[in-house]
Amino acid sequence: MKVHKGDMVLVISGPDKGAKGQVIAAFPKTEKVLVEGVNRIKKHVANSAPERGAESGGIVTQEAPIHVSNVMVIDSDGNPTRVGYRFDENGKKVRVSRRNGKDI
């Protein structure tokens, strides 16, 4: 998967189109990412189940995963770009911006 944890991404499709955020977690098996402040849902939590920082029960607002095809990585110039790969001089695989050719 070309989007990793810590990447800055732009949402290109869906209700949160145009929103920018940092990737909190990536789930390669399901091809989904968790983006900070994007795709927020309300979850009803029981009183006895402390989950994701909620000591008492009630309604908790949290991020839900979004499909990786609905986001684009933001490069060093601040523009959304597609991601490519190349091998550096040591033979290590690095991600490259398709827009400007710089390393991500």
From Swiss-Prot:
Oligomeric and partner information: Part of the 50S ribosomal subunit.
Region of interest: Disordered: 82-104
Protein name, entry field: Large ribosomal subunit protein uL24
Record family assignment: Belongs to the universal ribosomal protein uL24 family.
Record-level GO BP terms: translation
This protein's UniProt keywords: Ribonucleoprotein, Ribosomal protein, RNA-binding, rRNA-binding
MF terms (GO), sorted A to Z: rRNA binding; structural constituent of ribosome
Keyword Signal tagged: no
Entry function: One of two assembly initiator proteins, it binds directly to the 5'-end of the 23S rRNA, where it nucleates assembly of the 50S subunit. One of the proteins that surrounds the polypeptide exit tunnel on the outside of the subunit.
The keyword rRNA-binding belongs to this UniProt entry's keyword annotation: yes
Pfam families for the chain: KOW, ribosomal_L24
GO CC terms of this entry: ribonucleoprotein complex; ribosome
Gene from which the chain derives: rplX
Origin species: Corynebacterium glutamicum (strain ATCC 13032 / DSM 20300 / JCM 1318 / BCRC 11384 / CCUG 27702 / LMG 3730 / NBRC 12168 / NCIMB 10025 / NRRL B-2784 / 534)
HAMAP family: Ribosomal_uL24_B (MF_01326_B)
Composition bias type Basic residues, residue spans: 93-104
